[in-house]
Amino acid sequence: MSLNDDPRRYEHLSRIRLEDPEAVARAAATRRRHPGLKHGVQNFIVAADHPARGALSVGPEPMAMADRRDLLDRLQIALANPAVDGILASPDIMDDLLLLGALDGKLIFGSMNRGGLAGLVNEFDDRFTGHTAAALQALGADGGKMLTRICLGDPDTVATLEATAKAIDSLAERKLIAMVEPFLSVRDAHGKVRNDLRADAVIKSVGIAEGLGSTSAYTWMKLPVVADMERVMASTTLPTVLLGGDPDGSQDEVFASWQAALALPGVRGLTVGRTLLYPHDGDVAGAVATAASLLNNAGPATGSATGPAAGEPASSDRIPVKVSE
């Protein structure tokens, strides 16, 4: 990927933040809005809220997302593609992109709970430390996203579920979308949080998540692509976007799994980040263009959509898992 390597290329953002912090609110108020969501049109949202949870790794590179200038470069390349409908980001990244004028005509989803830091001793106590519903309304955002990891063996799960339900209600009161990303999760033998990606586990997490809050009128699901995806999508009537997660396997395998899943009823599109922002070959524009070409192009589903994170067939005794997003 060919990028501008001038270390001062974003120095103006620091200057604006120092001298004119109200510029963020003005940029949000004056930006051109997305024309709106329509049934039958799948949407493409780029996700960039991982650093706020201390999750900087991509594949084997533990600090891949550490350089903010590099990340902003990659995000601007992705957002420049007219097929990309919007952004999902933490407040710091969202504000940078607003100041850069990169969000004109885009959907905006804020990341609400980043308190469950990767590796934290009580990681399942995933507190709402990011965007609030009120802040998202003030930004003119379209909704908020919440990671909802459910660990049946951890008492902090109940507090996270309660906080998620309250956030869903707060968003719904403002007619904003609640994008809920549920997982059944466990700690492995080394104490690392991992998500259970068997279809039955994903289906159970969906059942729990879609029942949160006093209304589901504005609730969406954000789900992984796993083996037996038809059964997963049969478990909900809520609009659903597909997440990418930390890429493993070849890019061709990842894209093929997305294409199959995008053909299923109820799937509204993609909300992915690291797979496209940090592709194996470094070609961000190419990866984004390929992903965009999958939207609305898939024919009727004829078999299982097998995601790259699924690991073993559904009949295997081995539990396919992936580190949390």
Per-region residue spans from a language model:
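Anionic group-transfer/hydrolysis microenvironments
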Residues: 49-51, 183, 224, 275
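Catalytic-face loop-and-helix region of soluble metabolic enzyme cores
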Residues: 224-300, 317-324
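Intrinsically disordered, low-complexity terminal tails and inter-domain linkers enriched
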Residues: 300-318
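Alpha/beta catalytic barrel-like cores
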Residues: 1-117, 124-125, 265-268, 300, ...
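Generic structural "secondary-structure junction" signal
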Residues: 39, 185, 278-279
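A generic structural signal for short coil/turn motifs at secondary-structure boundaries
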Residues: 55-56, 118-121, 153-157, 278-280
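Alpha/beta enzyme core
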Residues: 60-82, 94, 99, 113-116, ...
